[in-house]
């Protein structure tokens, strides 16, 4: 189990670099988009002032995803080793969009932040990396990322400290976001781990990811309502050198300039896209 557990947590937390855009413009925003569908979101605590302009046109362009190291984002999440009751389908609207009501305040308050790769102990293992952030607020391990002109790649996982002996590189990196994102966008990614260790134990896996932007609509949170969110479905199939494989489904709700505002991750072995229990249910909140 030492072989499978940590490695499984890596890929299934995946958290899609959507954590990263959220770190750029979470609850720290000042000002809201205007009623006509446009507007600026200003990010005040990332050093130099950074702005992002969203137009709520149903498409998330690369320019509508910003990365500001040091910005903190707060989420509500179910406690470790619990299952949250969820409804990923939401309610249908007459215009074909959907409404997801995530206004429930239950769960623990957690904080995530984005850091740069400069000066990190693992920098030499990931020379192309730019950023790092925890994959799961309930675990210390970090996802390592590269943000390009048309995608954000997950390059691997590391522990915060070198003494833990956790380094899991992906070959090739997994494009967890591809731009532009709009309803119907889909892509797949295959990746393997080589020369990887989790707490000093060698690990190896072959992973296949399928990404689909499969819905658009309104997300209601305790403090905020987003009227033009995209839902990204990720299906992961993971095969190990020893032991059974793993399959999971994850949903991310993405918004221009805010990034990820909600997430649901199914239990292992889930095949129903309308699953009703999640090992992780995360919502942006104070």
Question: What feature does the model see in each segment?
Answer:
Residues 12, 154, 255-257:
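Short, structured coil/loop segments at alpha-helix boundaries
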Residues 26-35, 39-126, 189-286:
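Acidic, serine/threonine-rich low-complexity disordered tracts
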Residues 1-14:
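Bacterial N-terminal signal peptides that target proteins for export
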Residues 20-22:
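C-terminal motif of bacterial Sec signal peptides marking the signal peptidase cleavage site
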Residues 120-208, 212-213:
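Extracellular-facing segments of soluble proteins and assemblies that are Gly/Ser/Thr-biased and enriched
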């Amino acid at each position: 189990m030492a072989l499978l557990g940590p490695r499984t947590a890596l890929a299934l937390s995946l958290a899609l670099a959507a954590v990263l855009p959220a770190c750029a413009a979470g609850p720290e925003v000042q000002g809201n988009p205007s009623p006509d569908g446009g507007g600026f979101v200003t990010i005040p605590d990332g050093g130099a002032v950074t702005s992002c302009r969203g137009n709520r046109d149903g498409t998330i362009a690369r320019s509508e995803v910003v990365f500001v190291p040091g910005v903190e984002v707060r989420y509500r999440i179910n406690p470790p080793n619990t299952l949250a009751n969820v409804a990923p389908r939401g309610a249908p609207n007459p215009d074909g969009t959907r409404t997801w009501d995530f206004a429930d305040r239950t769960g623990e308050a957690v904080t995530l932040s984005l850091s740069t790769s400069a000066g990190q102990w693992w920098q030499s293992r990931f020379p192309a990396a730019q950023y790092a952030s925890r994959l799961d607020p309930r675990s210390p391990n970090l996802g390592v990322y590269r943000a390009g002109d048309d995608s954000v790649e997950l390059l691997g996982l590391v522990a915060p400290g070198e003494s833990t002996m956790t380094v899991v590189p992906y070959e090739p990196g997994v494009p967890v976001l591809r731009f532009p994102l709009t309803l119907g966008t889909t892509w797949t990614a295959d990746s393997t781990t080589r020369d990887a260790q989790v707490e000093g134990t060698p690990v190896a896996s072959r992973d296949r990811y399928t990404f689909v932007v499969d819905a658009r609509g309104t997300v209601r949170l305790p403090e905020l309502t987003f009227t033009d969110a995209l839902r990204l479905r990720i299906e992961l199939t993971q095969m190990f050198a020893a032991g059974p494989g793993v399959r999971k489904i994850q949903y991310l709700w993405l918004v221009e300039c805010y990034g990820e505002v909600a997430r649901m991750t199914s239990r292992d072995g889930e095949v129903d896209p309308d699953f009703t229990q999640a090992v992780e249910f995360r919502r942006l909140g104070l």
